[in-house]
UniProtKB/Swiss-Prot annotation:
<keyword id="KW-0378">Hydrolase</keyword>
<dbReference type="InterPro" id="IPR033704">
    <property type="entry name" value="dUTPase_trimeric"/>
</dbReference>
<comment type="similarity">
    <text>Belongs to the dUTPase family.</text>
</comment>
<dbReference type="GO" id="GO:0070207">
    <property type="term" value="P:protein homotrimerization"/>
</dbReference>
<keyword id="KW-0479">Metal-binding</keyword>
<dbReference type="GO" id="GO:0004170">
    <property type="term" value="F:dUTP diphosphatase activity"/>
</dbReference>
<dbReference type="Pfam" id="PF00692">
    <property type="entry name" value="dUTPase"/>
</dbReference>
<dbReference type="InterPro" id="IPR036157">
    <property type="entry name" value="dUTPase-like_sf"/>
</dbReference>
<keyword id="KW-0460">Magnesium</keyword>
<comment type="subunit">
    <text>Homotrimer.</text>
</comment>
<protein>
    <recommendedName>
        <fullName>Deoxyuridine 5'-triphosphate nucleotidohydrolase</fullName>
        <ecNumber>3.6.1.23</ecNumber>
    </recommendedName>
</protein>
<feature type="binding site">
    <location>
        <begin position="88"/>
        <end position="90"/>
    </location>
    <ligand>
        <name>substrate</name>
    </ligand>
</feature>
<keyword id="KW-0963">Cytoplasm</keyword>
<feature type="binding site">
    <location>
        <begin position="71"/>
        <end position="73"/>
    </location>
    <ligand>
        <name>substrate</name>
    </ligand>
</feature>
<feature type="short sequence motif" description="Motif 5, important for activity">
    <location>
        <begin position="142"/>
        <end position="152"/>
    </location>
</feature>
<dbReference type="GO" id="GO:0042802">
    <property type="term" value="F:identical protein binding"/>
</dbReference>
<dbReference type="GO" id="GO:0032991">
    <property type="term" value="C:protein-containing complex"/>
</dbReference>
Amino acid sequence: MMKKIDVKILDPRVGKEFPLPTYATSGSAGLDLRACLNDAVELAPGDTTLVPTGLAIHIADPSLAAMMLPRSGLGHKHGIVLGNLVGLIDSDYQGQLMISVWNRGQDSFTIQPGERIAQMIFVPVVQAEFNLVEDFDATDRGEGGFGHSGRQ
């Protein structure tokens, strides 16, 4: 059975002027989130800003979390990514979804009201329960770290 997540519309334009978040295709993992702005916002190279979505969610289920991710086209074509690289939404958070947008590109970029600026996915959560041990069971890799497995 598919899980349902409560969404609270904070801005009356959402669902009318600005479409509700949607999956672009039947195979899409991420919901597109839109900039719920009154006016366009220009981001100079290197600038960051917080952009409201006009939405709040309450996941409520502690076995789930949401992640906000950049849209691949904005990042690749314009250098527009998330200021915190990935946004994590805990199951007990109930506030507005805000997108930290960073222009890592070389040119100014204008975010238009209603523009799709990020995507959100839901992921399972596993919380660690730590055990103090003297040693781990041996593996082929052992303590090999950065670059240990080679490039080819």
